[in-house]
Amino acid sequence: MCSVHYNHSLAAMSGSDIMAYSLSLEQKTAFAFVGMLLVFLGLLIVRCFRILLDPYSSMPSSSWGDGLEGLEKGTFEYALT
């Protein structure tokens, strides 16, 4: 009643034909590039989730006025001289 048709090219190949089927250099390069992009995307996702879970750990603990010597923090007299 119902016949099953396989349109996949690898399903019709014999075992020795499958071993002979190889990716071209362009396909290998494309797969390597996509793989590197996926690894980079994964690292960015992990970094973003770490920042979302603990946002204050990535901020520096010093403030802008730590480097001032002899002046009070919050005064802008040093900018006028």
UniProtKB/Swiss-Prot annotation:
UniProt record similarity statement: Belongs to the cortexin family.
Subcellular localization, as worded in the UniProt entry: Membrane
Keywords: Membrane, Transmembrane, Transmembrane helix
Membrane topology annotation: Single-pass membrane protein
UniProt main location, coarse: membrane
Protein name per the record: Cortexin-2
One GO cellular component term noted in the UniProt record for this chain: membrane
Pfam family, one: Cortexin
Transmembrane segments: 29-49
